[in-house]
């Protein structure tokens, strides 16, 4: 193993008290814990806001109250997510690593854990969205005085929650393909399929609303214009081969780290 690979490695701790091990655990997984707590707080805040303002000011898009309490939220969501996705993606690409030989097995393994942490946060966010607003979306089409593309649940689901998944996936895709040696200078097909599937839900939503405007007045779950959501939702199945990839690469890195640690102890 080259000296460059060794010097760039992250030290692996051993022994110590429970407190020190817990501290090391939270430090290693701080992305998952901090970001997870943040998305839970955002999800809870949006759900509370919808509970307070949906019926009070969200039943008529053309009412002054809707323009005051819901449209600024929509504009803010679009601006924040656009800036976050573009700025983060550009930063990760501009600071990318070009020499995979400088990434040692310990550093590589720590990055796999970070990647799993980000995926855990995405799963937590998807569950939060499903629990807090998806179940009521179809009902809102029957509740609003004049059914439009802008309802309280639409503003939360289609203009923030689903785009937020894309806002996390795109930078993560770039990070993984510029920081992990196994993905550098190549493309993971399962990873790409997940990103494209979630991304394409947004234009499919536009097609869905166009269809509701001209063809389907009722929210029929099995309507053909809803088939795209099912097909694109199936892209999540690609997480299975992606997980197999990651665990296989992590197993190899763990073996390398264990061998490296043993050689250090022997020396």
Language-model features: where?
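Alpha-helical transmembrane segments and their helix-start/interface "positive-inside/aromatic belt" motifs
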Residues: 14-39, 105-121, 179-194, 246-249
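Alpha-helical transmembrane segments of multi-pass membrane proteins
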Residues: 37-55
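C-terminal transmembrane-bundle signature of multipass membrane proteins
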Residues: 41-42, 189-267
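Perimembrane loop-to-helix junctions flanking transmembrane segments
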Residues: 52-72
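Short aromatic-rich membrane-water interface segments that cap or initiate transmembrane helices
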Residues: 65-77, 146-160, 221-231
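Generic alpha-helical transmembrane segments
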Residues: 78-89, 155-173, 235-239
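Internal transmembrane alpha-helix with an interfacial aromatic "cap," most often the third helix
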Residues: 79-141, 172-173
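Membrane-proximal helix-loop-helix units in multi-pass membrane proteins
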Residues: 122-186
